[in-house]
């Protein structure tokens, strides 16, 4: 989860500087929302728990093309700064059968107008690129379960320093399990085996895609995350969206959020001198790399647009795009991304991820920083427990790309979370990426089988696969039994 309200902002202007959100935003929040206290939000998934918990957090404009082989409708790098009078365009991308529709929704003074354009896609091309088979399904499942498992096991060390991780978990660090979770004030807010807000919000995106028949709609996601912030998932026993990050909290509780989430996010970012770039967007977007992975433009624009609903810093968009493009490329398994043995050519994948993600950055210096995190090969370079900076979006993205270079899921995720810092978020992104690379069978069974809400998650996956078959004639169901064995 991104840095929570009241816990010291973890968004950073660079590796060496941090900037907190300035000013009191309470006058711009809806009066009925929970107000952040000095120590954080009183939120809990466990009945009777009173521990104060919130989290550290922190996406940009772009040209919105019609996915599945691109149709441009928006501007490239560096959109205009939002003002109270600005008209913002929120692109929604829908796929009907093998046709693509990009609808842009303009918002001004509470009014909406929509225009849609359609682009036909050659059926043979798209189905060939989708490459639907049992291997693909196992990688999709690896992405989803990898995210949730990495999140849940990462909770064990979240907000601890590396030294504290060793003190608490040294005896069992080679075989960490959910039941090893220490019972301190923070961790008692979640039951054993539960994931946190990172995966909650990923599932919000997943449900939005399913219930809108493949359309990726920032407005719909905005409504869902606002509702989740107030109630969580009641069907799972939640009474609030546990662990909301600072940037997310202030954005979704602005009065203008549902009318224009992009503008709301930009105003919150502006109050922080446009320097806060925390990880609350990249943590949730892995599922966008799965949906219609055959077209990278589709993935890129959806990742950027959903990130931007709460996080206005371009680095937040760039990091979300990099992660989602990597997942999509691995699902495609195109020859240019494989070596002679059929294994992934990680260098080629990184270079292509950089090409897409760097579109959201304006200067060579910012692009160089992006690449330095993508190429990271040693965890110590990321300084994941660095005081006051644990929630920087590039630290989380860097964790994912470090994991991409590993070959053992359990060992890699354990090593990563034992670095401390924002471990659940780093674990979620790394778990999604490595799970996609190594498939779901690479994830330790003691982690997948002991996820608290495993069966609930499986029903959502089942709904997605059936939606893709019924609406888009893309059939994953022969390779999916409805549950993990």
Pin down the residues of each PLM region.
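Structured, active/binding-site neighborhoods that engage oxygen-rich ligands
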Residues: 2-47, 51, 55-76, 84-485
């Amino acid at each position: 989860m991104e840095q929570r309200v009241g816990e010291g902002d973890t968004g950073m202007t660079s590796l060496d500087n941090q900037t907190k959100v300035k000013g009191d935003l309470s006058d711009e929040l809806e009066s009925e929302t929970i107000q952040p206290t000095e120590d954080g939000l009183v939120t809990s998934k466990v009945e009777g728990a009173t521990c104060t918990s919130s989290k550290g957090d922190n996406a940009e404009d772009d040209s919105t093309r019609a996915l599945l082989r691109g149709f441009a409708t928006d501007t490239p790098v560096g959109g205009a700064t939002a003002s109270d009078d600005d008209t913002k365009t929120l692109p929604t991308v829908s796929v009907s059968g093998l046709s693509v529709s990009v609808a842009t929704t303009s918002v001004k003074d509470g009014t909406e107008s929509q225009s849609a354009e359609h682009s036909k896609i050659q059926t043979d091309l798209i189905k060939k690129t989708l490459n639907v088979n049992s291997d693909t399904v196992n990688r999709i499942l690896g992405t989803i379960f990898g995210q949730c498992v990495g999140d849940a096991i990462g909770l064990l060390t979240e907000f601890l320093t590396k030294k504290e991780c060793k003190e608490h978990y040294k005896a069992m660090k080679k075989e960490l399990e959910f039941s090893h979770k220490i019972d301190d004030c923070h961790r008692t807010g979640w039951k054993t085996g539960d994931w946190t807000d990172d995966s909650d919000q990923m599932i919000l995106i997943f449900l939005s895609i399913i219930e809108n028949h493949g359309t990726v709609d920032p407005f719909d996601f905005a409504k869902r995350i606002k509702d989740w912030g107030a109630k969580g998932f009641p069907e799972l026993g939640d009474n609030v969206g546990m662990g909301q990050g600072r940037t997310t909290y202030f954005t979704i509780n602005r009065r203008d959020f549902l009318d224009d989430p992009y503008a709301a996010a930009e105003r919150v970012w502006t109050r922080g001198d446009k320097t806060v770039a925390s990880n609350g967007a990249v943590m949730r977007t892995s599922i966008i790399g799965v949906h219609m992975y055959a077209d990278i433009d589709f993935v890129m624009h959806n990742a950027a647009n959903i990130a931007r609903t709460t996080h206005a810093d371009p680095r937040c968009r760039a990091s979300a795009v990099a992660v989602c493009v990597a997942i999509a490329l691995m699902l495609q398994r195109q020859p240019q991304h494989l070596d002679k043995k059929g294994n992934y050519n990680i260098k080629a994948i990184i270079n292509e991820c950089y090409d897409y993600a760097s579109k959201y950055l304006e200067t060579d210096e910012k692009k160089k920083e992006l690449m330095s995190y993508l190429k990271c090969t040693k965890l110590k370079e990321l300084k994941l427990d660095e005081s006051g900076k644990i929630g920087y979006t590039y630290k989380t993205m860097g964790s994912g790309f470090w994991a991409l270079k590993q070959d053992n899921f359990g060992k890699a995720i354990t090593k990563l979370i034992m670095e401390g810092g924002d471990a659940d978020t780093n674990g979620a992104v790394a778990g999604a990426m490595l799970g996609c690379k190594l498939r779901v069978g690479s994830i330790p069974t003691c982690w997948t089988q002991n996820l608290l809400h495993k069966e609930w998650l499986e029903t959502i996956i089942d709904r997605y696969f059936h939606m893709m078959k019924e609406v888009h004639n893309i059939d994953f169901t022969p390779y999916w039994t409805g549950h993990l064995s």
